[in-house]
Amino acid sequence: MNILIDADGCPVVDLTLQIAKRFGVPVIILCDTAHQIEREGAQTLVFDKGADSVDFALVNRVKAGDIVVTQDYGLASMCLAKCARVLNQNGLEYTADNMEALMLRRYENKKLLRAGKHPKGSPKRTKEQDEAFVATLTDILASI
């Protein structure tokens, strides 16, 4: 089992590494050339910039039983299909039960963008979001 991080814009790389170290789980950081993220104790794989290049590389590497950290619903859906556990940076674990609603939200947001309406951006990251992420990842690893 590995933890794979879709690291482009991911605010929990260091938290993930701390928790993974405690459980002795290897971490693979995947990023593009615009976001080269090197961390001691993790393998970093860097890919060319391009639409979804990191996402496709991650999907090609993920195996059943791996854990994936991403905020990309499409990537999460593909990883779930490969029997991985998937969570976002706020501690939400993606499941077959919540994926349909999340994908619908993504579709609606893309429709708004095409219509020239820009959805409100995310607020500043909070300590509570970090705590929720730590709790979810710890629970997943403790249950294995």
Predicted features and spans:
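Nuclease catalytic cores that cleave nucleic-acid phosphodiester bonds
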Residues: 2-144
